[in-house]
Structures are given as structure tokens and as C-alpha cells.
Amino acid sequence: MAKQDYYEILGVSKTAEEREIKKAYKRLAMKYHPDRNQGDKEAEAKFKEIKEAYEVLTDSQKRAAYDQYGHAAFEQGGMGGGGFGGGADFSDIFGDVFGDIFGGGRGRQRAARGADLRYNMELTLEEAVRGVTKEIRIPTLEECDVCHGSGAKPGTQPQTCPTCHGSGQVQMRQGFFAVQQTCPHCQGRGTLIKDPCNKCHGHGRVERSKTLSVKIPAGVDTGDRIRLAGEGEAGQHGAPAGDLYVQVQVKQHPIFEREGNNLYCEVPINFAMAALGGEIEVPTLDGRVKLKVPGETQTGKLFRMRGKGVKSVRGGAQGDLLCRVVVETPVGLNEKQKQLLQELQESFGGPTGEHNSPRSKSFFDGVKKFFDDLTR
């Protein structure tokens, strides 16, 4: 069976330049590659034809022989053993077209970026609300100041890896394919350090603690994270440094609780003020302010003091302070006080005075109805 013309296989003219041939090969190789057509024998045979045509037409000597003698140039005795499969380097094609399949292409492995670091910072509520600048000390890896990150002894330079010749990749042939792998000798860096730095022992980085001044913006809360770009560990062999993340944890406050941008606090008042009303001082983060308590105030009533909360870290309106009233039962009464309270209770008409204690009346009426229903 006559073999198909190489130019026809690739779909190019006989005057096509090498770049046109490469372009045609990339397109066809992608289409008929066995990994994309598993089990398809026709596609596999087509791929072999495409590869054979490419190898001949991109070799100037083989192409000239083919143009003059056709396929006869590569038959036994035709060209002094030149034959197909003479070991052409397809790394330029495979590196571009099949980089993902064969280990990521031809390029040298990039030096690793430095690791990110985390620092847990505890703040008081006042610091979180107002903002604060704090100094912290963190252990990290910094660029070696002797070799400046190269890992080589001063006055020397890292040498090109003799295994991969500086590419960071080695080529392993498997059948028709040249498989690219990370060089095991230099771990993909493309260079070797023959004379390592005495301080960092060739690593390019040294362990060190550093002090940083961290500005905490006003309004942060537990769980917020502040990023300091480039303040993490130094990268390997000149690669970028990682980042430092400051994780905020706000301590519990003895008076205030925070929910979002609002603050809450409990304000105890005696039962006389709860009944008669009056004025008390309540704490805020800016100092004491007066709060008017109306008569007949019950435990649990909330009083809102606008703008006395927390300003959002993202800007916008300021939160409020909500004061929850707790009516205290008097303790440590003397005989006179007990007598006065007894007289007061009698003036109410007893423990369940209907007029002065509407909630008590409602409660006891409900209890009475419950037992009445049980006895019916």
C-alpha cells in the first residue's frame, strides 16, 4: 500500500516554512493524541503518521531527501541508515502542547514562595473599638544576609546543573513520547551549589526573630484578620516572601458585651427607682452618661443610647449602646425597713394586688384557672 504524502498528512504545501509545519503538527497532534482517543486504533495510527511526517519535514536533510526521492529515501538502502525514528528532539512541541500531560512543560521549576505566618493577637475591647498600634515579635525564616539568598558562599555562584543543563527538567523516553520530569539532581532549580554559604549552609535562609509594628484599625472584632504583605517567611533562592496574618481575639469585658457594632450592658436599679422613676449614671466607652428611668420600669427593659457603640471597621454609622435594666430585690433589711415593706404590701391589697401588680394578678388568675379546670 502506497504511503500518503507527508505534506498531505500535515495539510501544508511543499513550500511551507518550518513554523507552518510546527503549527499544523500541534493542531493535528492535539486532535489525534492517544490519550484523547483511548482505544481508537485509527486515531493511534493517524498520530503515528503525523509524528513521522513532522520528524521528516522539520529536519532539513531528511526533507531535502524526501523532496527528491519521496518515501524511497528512507527505505532500506535509500539513505545510509537514516530511517525513521532517528531520535529527533520533540521537547519544543511536547513542552507547549502536552505540558499538562507530561509533567508541566519544559520550564525551570520556580523557587518556592515563602510560607505564610499567623500571629494570634489578644486585644481589650477598648483597643478593638478605638484602634491601637502594637509591637509583636515573631520567629521566622529570613533571607541570609551573607549570601543574599543565593545559598552560595560569597565570591562564588551557583553552578548550572550538569544533569538537566539548567532547564530544571530531564527527558525520559517512553515509546514515541519524550516525557518531561523534574530533574532529581537539582530538584528543578537548574542550578547546584558546590560551595555553600557558611551561615545558611546553602539554604539561602536563616532562622531569626523579628519585631514588627502592627497598626490595628478601629472597629475590629474577634475573627478579623489583618494581612501584612511580605512579612511571612522569606522565599527560597530569591522567591517572594510569604505574608503574615494577624488574627484578632477580643478579650471578655467585665461590663460590656458586643454584638456586631452594638454594645450591651446590664444596669441594676432598686425597686423604688423602678417604681417611681429617676436618673442614674451608666458607663460607656467614652465615660459616664446620665440615663432617665421612667416610673413603673420592669426588669429586662432596654434603653438605647444611640451612637455609643462601635464604629464599623469598614466605615459607616456607629453602633448603639443598649442598657438592660435589672430590678434588684433589697437584701439585709432592718426591722424598720421590713415593717415599711409590710405596710406597703398591705396597701397593695396583699401579695397579688390587682391594681399595683397587673402581671402578678394575671399570673395567679392563670394558676387558679388551671386548678379549677383540673377539678371539673
From Swiss-Prot:
Subcellular localization(s) per the UniProt record: Cytoplasm
Organism: Shigella boydii serotype 18 (strain CDC 3083-94 / BS512)
HAMAP family: DnaJ
Binding positions (Zn(2+) 1): 144, 147, 197, 200
Species classification: Bacteria, Pseudomonadati, Pseudomonadota, Gammaproteobacteria, Enterobacterales
Gene3D superfamilies named in the record: DnaJ domain (1.10.287.110), Heat shock protein DnaJ, cysteine-rich domain (2.10.230.10), Urease metallochaperone UreE, N-terminal domain (2.60.260.20)
GO terms for MF: ATP binding; heat shock protein binding; unfolded protein binding; zinc ion binding
PANTHER family: CHAPERONE PROTEIN DNAJ (PTHR43096:SF48), DNAJ HOMOLOG 1, MITOCHONDRIAL-RELATED (PTHR43096)
Protein name, UniProt field: Chaperone protein DnaJ
Swiss-Prot/TrEMBL keywords: Chaperone, Cytoplasm, DNA replication, Metal-binding, Repeat, Stress response, Zinc, Zinc-finger
Cofactor remark: Binds 2 Zn(2+) ions per monomer.
